[in-house]
């Protein structure tokens, strides 16, 4: 047995050595506490000791069109005996060991080993215990004065990133918070004018109070023994300037991921670990940033004229359709030939979430012009559905939103000049969309607290008020019921079109109210709803039949995800899409696969 070195701070590691001639080997870790008792539900992440070794030859990213093997990271959880095993790998590995309430441990064996005996030491420092808690705990405890203010803040200020992580909760003056809010308004937040004035002082004081009084922070719910048997695999994609937004598990077995900020489409083969990058083309003369050129003018590295956002696949020929939110067009990608086709639109602003219906028509929300678009592949023509507005001011703004952004691109700071109310009047924001089995088109409208229905046969539009704030993204289950995220309310909601009844299910969370579920998807064959837990660094699953929850913690802190996709066997995929990427632990965005036993 080796004695612990001072550098490990009393953490005991015993290495049982194997023959040095072994070319590859499996590794088993046994994790105990200082008394020698086994520790269950310990998260152990195995990763290449030399790092991901990514190709950065194309302005920091892989050269396009060249398939390269990427070594994934694998995470598993210890069983009741404290054991966790990893299959053999041909490269040297290191291990990151984590369990709430204990000190993290990083192990980089100097020799090849088949067995590692690891002792984790309980963390007793209240400050360090608080720092290790997920952002959802800090956000849930943050006092902003009243519930309505908190809900409005969570709706507008968790669009792109967490609130409460270590970067956000650091000491800032009210003036510094005011500068941040000013910049976020230009990025697209619609925080009300009154809250732009009031919140800088409250945020500065609120986070300071929590830092100085860690006893005010609740303990998150404990990790479940059911985590044993789950395997999480991560493929590193992009860099700290990337925003790998939505992804698609295609019928060809490959996974496609869009980098919104760098205009790249990643093609990942989960079986071979080979990754190929394709650059999304643009028209000659188009500016960096596209039609939204002023929005990210101060961002350090921005190589995008399209802002690739959401993806959907045709069931007929496997072509992939991509919404470029910074252009007035639809992008089509042929996975067989790798060719892109750009379909130009005559109107609309900010193509957003996309789906393909049973008749091979492509439907997507057009967020800032308050529309839903349909692209008929047979005729190659677009049909635009104008959604109702909440008055003349909103009609005027959505009608001429292109002119507003044109002025902003010329340096006129309209996003900071124009008054904003808590209803975000002027930007109703149609967001998520899905097609029910009967062919009806349903969408969510984030800022009006509504869902809507389009009958493709008649063109009739029906709007339905929701009994909750912030319906963001929605999906249908096998029975045609809709599942909707209540974004600022830490809940999901089921809507039955047959009865017009809403049923709410709160996320299993401590403290209540600290998470912002951005999106969800339904594994229809198994009746499981998967939910993105953006503040809690987790994915939630909800069994529709038993109405029971489970929580799967993700390996990295600051895991902010925006969608879930499935393989036919129910294996789930998501991707770290935090903006900015340098907030993420290790500064690395990844494609994530979750396999359950």
Question: Language-model features: where?
Answer:
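Structural motif
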Residues: 27-39
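Short, acidic Ser/Thr/Gly-rich low-complexity loop/linker segments typical of extracellular
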Residues: 50-87
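A short, solvent-exposed loop/turn motif at the edges and junctions
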Residues: 94-109
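The canonical Cys-X-X-Cys-His
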Residues: 153-164, 199, 203
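Beta-rich, blade/repeat-based domains predominating
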Residues: 240-251, 284-316, 347-359, 391-437, ...
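Conserved beta-strand positions in repeat-built beta-propeller and related beta-rich domains
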Residues: 255-260, 304-306, 313-314, 320-326, ...
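Short loop/turn segments that connect beta-strands within beta-propeller blades
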Residues: 269-273, 334-338, 376-380, 455-459, ...
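Blade-level signature of beta-propeller repeat domains, shared across WD40, Kelch, NHL, RCC1
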Residues: 561-597
